[in-house]
A protein has these predicted regions:
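Iron-sulfur (Fe-S) cluster-binding modules
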Residues: 1-2, 87
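Intrinsic-disorder/low-complexity, polar/charged segments enriched in Ser/Thr/Lys/Arg/Asp/Glu/Gln
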Residues: 11, 38-42, 79-81
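Amphipathic, hydrophobic secondary-structure cores in small proteins
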Residues: 22-66, 70
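An N-terminal amphipathic alpha-helical segment
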Residues: 2-36
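C-terminal edge-of-domain segments
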Residues: 70-87
Length: 87
């Protein structure tokens, strides 16, 4: 997914590293409820299930997934990074 051309400064950052399903999505849901329309929530995760759970969450609830990427952290472990804009 490529980066959009608008301001991507997150209103909320969630560190869900080390948490397993369903906790990352539950935390995202709480953050989205507390934010206002157009706000961006940034999520960092280590659970591979977020790679399909977060896109489904966005589609189902009408939020925009601006960024979904994965990379290796300093310990060579896979990490997931998301930017979600509240619809």
């Amino acid at each position: 997914m490529s980066m959009p051309e608008h301001d991507l400064t997150p209103a909320i950052q969630l560190n869900t590293r080390g948490l397993r399903c369903p906790e990352p999505v539950m935390m995202l849901h709480q953050a989205i409820r507390k934010s206002k329309s157009g706000d961006i929530v940034e999520v960092f995760a280590t659970d591979p299930s977020t790679s399909w759970d977060i896109p489904k969450f966005c589609t189902h609830l009408g939020h925009e997934l601006l960024l979904q990427e994965e990379h290796l952290d300093a310990n060579e472990l896979k990490e997931y990074h998301y930017l979600i804009q509240k619809g």
